Each structure stands twice: as C-alpha cells, then as structure tokens.
Amino acid sequence: LRGKEDAANNYARGHYTVGKELIEVCADRIRKLADQCEGLQGFLVFHSVGGGTGSGFGSLLLQRLALEYGGKKSKLDFCVYPSPQVSTSVVEPYNSVLSTHSLLEHTDVSFMLDNEAIYNICKKSLDIEKPTYTNLNRLIAQVISSLTSSLRFPGPLNLDINDIQTNLVPFPRLHFVLCSYAPVISKEKSEHENITVDAITNSVFSENNIMAKCQPHLGKYMACCLMYRGNIVPKEAQKAVQNIRNEKSKTVSFVDWSPTGFKCGINNSKPTTVLGENGDNMARTEKSVCMLSNTTAISQVFSRINHKFDLMYIKRAFVHWYVGEGMEEGEGL
C-alpha cells in the first residue's frame, strides 16, 4: 500500500485529509488477510506518534480496527514516543498528545518505546558508536520476537496474547507498558561473561535496559510479565523472581492492591540474532528474558510531553496548520 503524498508531520493531515483517502483500501486489505487466518488472536500495530502518518493515520486505523473487530480481537500497539533530547519535528508534542487520546480508547495494550533510550542501549551495551535505525529496529525486534515466541514455539509455560493482556492491564485505560530486554551484550563481551538466569533477571529491572526514558524506581509496579526464552528450567526462573522480591524490594515495589505482581512465561526456543551485515554487534545467547511492566513511572513520559505541549499551545503556536486540515480548535487541541 502506498500513497502519493506524506502527512507533513501533521496529525490532522494524516487523520483527516490524506488518511481518509487510504483508510478504505487499507481496511479492505486487512479484512482479506484476516479471512485467511485460521485462529486470529489479534493485531500488532507498529508506528511512531511524533510524525503525521504514525500519529494521524495510525489513530484512524486503530479506530477502524476497533469498529470492525470490537473487543473480540486484541490490539497490541508498539508506539515510538518522542525522546527528551532527540527531536525530529517541532510539532511532535501536538501529534503525540492527539495520538495518545486515540491509543487510550482504541488499543488493548500499548508498548512504549523511545529512540533515545534504545540509542543509549546500543552505545553502552553493544559498543556501537553511531547506531543506525537498523540497529535500533533489531533491538526492538528481540522484544517482539520474545512476545510472540509462545505463539510460534512449544514451551513449559507458554503465554498467548490474551494471557499477556489479562496479566498486564489492571484497568482498561491503564494499558501503557514499558519494555526491557536482557542480555544485550556484544560478541566480544559474551565470550568471557557467564549469563545466568539471576543475572539477566536483575538486568531487565535496570534503568539502563528499559526502552523508554524514565526512572522506574520512582514509580510503583502494578503488574510485571517476565518472558524467558531458551535453556531455562522453571525452578530457576521462580528462584530469580523470588530474589527480586527479597533483594530489590526497595526499588521494585508493587502497589498494595497487587501483591503477587509477577507473571512468568518460559519458552524453549533459543533467542536468535541477525549477525553481521550492518555492523550489528549483538551476541547470540543461550537464554534471554523480556520484561513487560505496567508501572506508574510511565507518567514521567506523559508529563514531559504535556509540558512541551502546554508551552506551545498557550501561545497557539502552529495551531493554524491543524485547523487548516479540517480540525476544530476545540477538538483535542
């Protein structure tokens, strides 16, 4: 599917003007693909919320999926939020706030990512001096691969999409989730490092491994899902979780109405990485863990964007571009 013009970093253009021309064709293609599936569980949607197409057309598509499939099929959304330091557009805060409103209403789980956090992981853990988008995408791919491995391979404690949703979302609107992955280790370091279940479980709770810029120790966890892959015995995973409860009780604290907190999934297939071609430096390991956590610390991401939004909107800066594409000033803005 392709169009003849872009959304020019404008949510209203992606949602109302250009989006309206493409949504019918897009919905029809999705319908045809869905008809070919034997047991459709849901949809994975990938987009950014800072630009015009990802925020505007992404929101329109999610609304359409909600309309056509209702609550019967899960909608899991991977959204790249603007970074604190790395900005690609002046109007990112407008697009992000408008898009978030739609994500609140029309997705079941939203996994929040930001480029700056993933850049830092590539630099610090993989020793890549100038990470490219390919490097970033390969790292995000590890999270998505861990998330879907239970659907694709057998394992002693498999989790499907519905399990993830049930265990991570305590209230319908509190469905924004942080992702973290370990081990992220370069080929050179992997040769002389002992990768244990305890070590990788500790790593995913480190601020340096979380794929969105925030400080989790300042928030409280509502739910936490640990998805292990590879050569892992259930007893080892349970022991590692118990250690987190005991040793990190000050930094990993749960809300009082969710005392159990942890859900574990174990899959026997080893993690795979794409080696070589683009200067990728990620080592293949025997075991890995992906953590999905619903924590109040995610409010830090929203506060940052809200602050930037308010600074511009108080002066009505750039608002005319949105009104010119068919939005009303009171509508979201």
UniProtKB/Swiss-Prot annotation:
Residues that coordinate or bind GTP: S48, G52, T53, T88, N115, N137
GO biological process: microtubule-based process
InterPro entries with a match to the protein in the record: Alpha_tubulin (IPR002452), Tub_FtsZ_C (IPR008280), Tubulin (IPR000217), Tubulin/FtsZ-like_C (IPR037103), Tubulin/FtsZ_2-layer-sand-dom (IPR018316), Tubulin/FtsZ_GTPase_sf (IPR036525), Tubulin_C (IPR023123), Tubulin_CS (IPR017975)
A GO CC annotation given for this chain: microtubule
SMART domains, sorted: Tubulin, Tubulin_C
Reaction(s) this enzyme catalyzes, per UniProt: GTP + H2O = GDP + phosphate + H(+)
Localization: Cytoplasm, Cytoskeleton
Enzyme Commission designation: 3.6.5.-
Cofactor(s) required for function per UniProt: Mg(2+)
UniProt keywords, alphabetically: Cytoplasm, Cytoskeleton, GTP-binding, Hydrolase, Microtubule, Nucleotide-binding
GO molecular function, one term: hydrolase activity
Superkingdom classification of source: Eukaryota
Pfam families membership: Tubulin (PF00091), Tubulin_C (PF03953)
Function: Tubulin is the major constituent of microtubules, a cylinder consisting of laterally associated linear protofilaments composed of alpha- and beta-tubulin heterodimers. Microtubules grow by the addition of GTP-tubulin dimers to the microtubule end, where a stabilizing cap forms. Below the cap, tubulin dimers are in GDP-bound state, owing to GTPase activity of alpha-tubulin.
Similarity comment text for this entry: Belongs to the tubulin family.
UniProt-listed PANTHER family: TUBULIN
Protein name: Tubulin alpha chain
Organism of origin: Dictyostelium purpureum
Organism lineage: Eukaryota, Amoebozoa, Evosea, Eumycetozoa, Dictyostelia
